Amino acid sequence: MKKYRVQPDGRFELKRFDPDDTSAFEGGKQAALEALAVLNRRLEKLQELLYAEGQHKVLVVLQAMDAGGKDGTIRVVFDGVNPSGVRVASFGVPTEQELARDYLWRVHQQVPRKGELVIFNRSHYEDVLVVRVKNLVPQQVWQKRYRHIREFERMLADEGTTILKFFLHISKDEQRQRLQERLDNPEKRWKFRMGDLEDRRLWDRYQEAYEAAIRETSTEYAPWYVIPANKNWYRNWLVSHILVETLEGLAMQYPQPETASEKIVIE
């Protein structure tokens, strides 16, 4: 899925990516759902292998505008995986304790251990997105954080962490429809907050901030993928495909038993 991977050449432009794009899958929604079911079963096996081998660490970062589909992606793509080896870490407004430390402190505590796959629902990237858009810190502060993040992720990669970063790219009109659906559906209304409307008014500034963050921090060791996310079925299939392809590339193997257990007969 090279077309969705952001190259570290400093030329990334978000406008080149169409949130309605479905060109990487030959077929419609139903065929994609069937393909996703196959990928889910494959991911289940690969995650079991990751856990059993206990050597690799995998970090998946999900970022998106409000209503961009982070929760839905986690729910669908990781359906069926073993909870003992998979963990979701969500990053909301920093607590008083977190604010008393550097902004990466709370993030570093949540990175995966050997054999574990961790999904970041939002992440350290909020500290070059929200803080920039809402002027929470001076420019000279958030500007330095691009370098901090590159070096932080370089350290994780050097220590054996495979990093995949996904920006779930939706259009402004698609966001409007999804937010309205939340308001109109009593079972989804709990997800709506008034701050969503404030952030929506800052749409263009957020797009600029995302473009800069992705351009500055997509590297060979921690690449960004821009995922067209207006259509949920395509988003889920594409994220799953990239994840499965990456895990297969790790060439993992089940560990050898301590003894020749295949010869043991239990009486």
Swiss-Prot record:
InterPro entries: P-loop_NTPase (IPR027417), Polyphosphate_phosphotransfera (IPR016898), PPK2-rel_1 (IPR022300), PPK2-related (IPR022488). One of its GO terms (biological process) is polyphosphate metabolic process. Its cofactor is Mn(2+). Its EC number is 2.7.4.-. SUPFAM superfamilies: P-loop containing nucleoside triphosphate hydrolases. Keywords: Kinase, Manganese, Transferase. It comes from the Bacteria. Pfam families: PPK2. Optimum temperature is 60-70 degrees Celsius. It catalyses: [phosphate](n) + ADP = [phosphate](n+1) + AMP; [phosphate](n) + ATP = [phosphate](n+1) + ADP. GO terms for molecular function: polyphosphate kinase activity. Uses inorganic polyphosphate (polyP) as a donor to convert both AMP to ADP and ADP to ATP. Can also use GMP, CMP, UMP, GDP, CDP and UDP. Belongs to the polyphosphate kinase 2 (PPK2) family. Class III subfamily. This is AMP/ADP-polyphosphate phosphotransferase. It comes from Meiothermus ruber (strain ATCC 35948 / DSM 1279 / VKM B-1258 / 21).
